[in-house]
């Protein structure tokens, strides 16, 4: 049934004898069209003879219609079905017309949301559960030097991203919530802030609790927070059992420079020994003796060597500070050749260590494809590995899908687990890699700064010696001047005594006569 039949039958679009809207219908024809096309309900509707724009129901003029119900503003107030407009004496129909597209609850005149829930708020992710926090802390603390290292231990952004991706995969494997890398970084930052605040409170409580402070037992760190505290340089308290000692180089007294040289020589020897051990273990990779214990020993040796290199770099910095401080010139001339020799030995050892690390990483990567391919692989290459010119249509595309599905059962769960373990081992090896070039540059900059400090000390000593010579000359002149004054005083004193004696003799002789 069309709207024309409704209008002719005195229904929805019927009109009275004076051209106005009829009370037999709910709304005029134009009103039904407005509702169907624009989702607007209003009463009365302008007559077709009127060319003026009549005001319709809306807020602040919204919902105005031009001739024949044409909208002239972007939006109009939405009213649901069955709601009578204000000021109308006749109820509106509870059902909308069945002709034309319906946009009553979806969009306004221009396709925008017109209902009360126009914008849907972004759903907030749930907080980290204890299991997710434990996995995050264990993984991040394990690769902390690679993720947050600076200076000598700073890694490339791509390598850090791979490590974060691996940590994200481990956290999402728990199945509690779908996280991303940003969530992990924010959670780690919040954990560090909480631990830093607790460490400060514990330190204040150790020095002496204030009268208004709470109990120190309430500030005790949890095991997870203790692991986070170990990533700080030296913020933990000794009473908690997880205090971190600062590098030994920062605790050396300026008078014990020779002890610092001996420590650096021992570190160079340890690095060379680690290089020899790693080369021996490198030959066993890919052989029947390649076991998990061998991989663990490689990882442990590289971690210890990285710590030794960091301690050696701290020793170089400490020696530069000691040489920059007060030091006799004779001792400075004696210690400088020894420092240059140790610096050269350390640079050579670090370069050899970097070469061995690269070899280990390359060989580990080369072993991963061997584990993936194996003996179960079909001689036919899957469709995804074929070149574009080889993907010739032959019958239908289902043939290629069938070939790929035929290849998938060849890879078992054990193979996937082995691949995952090897990938973790490769990632672990890459996390142990150090930027050798950056280390050499840092050592060169340290030595150059040290040379500048030594030169400045020599210049200061020369200036001090020249000033001392000038002071000596001034003192000699002052002594000569003082001697002359003493001589003059002696002369005047002797002359006075002589004159006094003469006067006494004259007086004595005159008295006798």
Curated annotation (Swiss-Prot):
Limits of the t-SNARE coiled-coil homology domain: 416-478
InterPro entries: Myb_DNA-bind_5, SNARE, Syntaxin_N, T_SNARE_dom
Keyword field contains Membrane: yes
GO biological process, one term: vesicle docking
Residue numbers of Phosphoserine PTMs: 378
Disordered, as annotated region: 1-23, 49-128
Keyword Ribonucleoprotein: no
GO cellular component: endomembrane system; SNARE complex; synaptic vesicle
Primary location: membrane
Protein name as catalogued: t-SNARE domain-containing protein 1
Organism this protein belongs to: Homo sapiens (Human)
Gene encoding the protein: TSNARE1
């Amino acid at each position: 049934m069309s709207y024309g039949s409704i209008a002719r039958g005195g229904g929805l679009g019927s009109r009275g004898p004076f051209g106005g809207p009829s009370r037999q219908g709910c709304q005029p024809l134009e009103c039904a069209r407005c509702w169907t096309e624009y989702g607007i309900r209003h009463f009365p509707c302008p007559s077709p003879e009127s060319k003026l724009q009549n005001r319709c129901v809306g807020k602040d003029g919204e919902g105005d219609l031009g001739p024949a119900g044409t909208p002239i503003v972007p939006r109009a107030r939405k009213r649901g079905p069955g709601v009578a407009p204000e000021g109308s004496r006749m109820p509106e129909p509870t059902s909308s017309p069945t002709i034309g597209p319906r946009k009553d609850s979806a969009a306004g005149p221009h396709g925008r949301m017109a209902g009360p829930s126009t914008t849907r708020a972004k759903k907030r992710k749930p907080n980290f559960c204890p299991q997710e926090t434990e996995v995050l802390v264990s993984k991040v603390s394990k690769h902390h030097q690679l993720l947050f290292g600076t200076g000598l231990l700073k890694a490339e952004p791509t390598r850090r991203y791979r490590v974060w991706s691996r940590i994200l995969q481990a956290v999402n494997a728990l199945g509690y919530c779908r996280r991303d890398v940003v969530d992990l970084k924010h959670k780690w930052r919040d954990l560090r802030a909480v631990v830093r605040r607790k460490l400060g409170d514990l330190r204040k409580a150790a020095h002496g609790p204030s009268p208004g402070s709470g109990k120190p037992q309430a500030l005790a760190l949890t095991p997870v927070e203790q692991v986070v505290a170990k990533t700080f340089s030296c913020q933990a308290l000794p009473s908690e059992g997880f205090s971190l000692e600062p590098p030994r180089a920062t605790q050396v007294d300026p008078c014990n420079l020779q002890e610092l040289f001996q420590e650096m020589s021992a570190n160079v020897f340890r690095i060379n020994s680690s290089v020899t051990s790693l080369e021996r273990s490198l030959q066993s990779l890919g052989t029947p003796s390649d076991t998990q214990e061998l991989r663990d020993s490689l990882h442990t040796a590289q971690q210890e060597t990285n710590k030794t290199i960091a301690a050696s770099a701290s020793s170089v910095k400490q020696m530069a500070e000691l040489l920059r401080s007060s030091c006799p010139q004779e001792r400075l001339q004696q210690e400088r050749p020894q420092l240059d020799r140790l610096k050269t030995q350390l640079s050579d050892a670090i370069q050899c260590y970097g070469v061995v690390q690269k070899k280990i990483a390359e060989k580990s990567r080369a072993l991963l494809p061997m584990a993936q391919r194996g003996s179960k692989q079909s001689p036919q290459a899957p469709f995804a590995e074929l070149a574009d010119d080889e993907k010739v249509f032959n019958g239908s595309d289902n043939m290629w899908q069938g070939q790929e599905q035929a290849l998938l059962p060849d890879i078992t769960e054990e193979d996937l687990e082995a691949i995952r373990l090897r990938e973790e081992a490769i990632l672990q090896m890459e996390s142990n890699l150090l930027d050798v070039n950056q280390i050499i540059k840092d050592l060169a900059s340290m030595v150059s700064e040290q040379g500048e400090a030594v030169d400045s000390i020599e210049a200061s000593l020369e200036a001090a010696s020249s000033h001392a010579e000038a002071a000596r000359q001034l003192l000699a002149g002052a002594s000569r001047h003082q001697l002359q004054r003493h001589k003059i005083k002696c002369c005047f004193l002797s002359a006075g005594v002589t004159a006094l004696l003469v006067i006494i003799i004259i007086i004595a002789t005159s008295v006798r006569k």
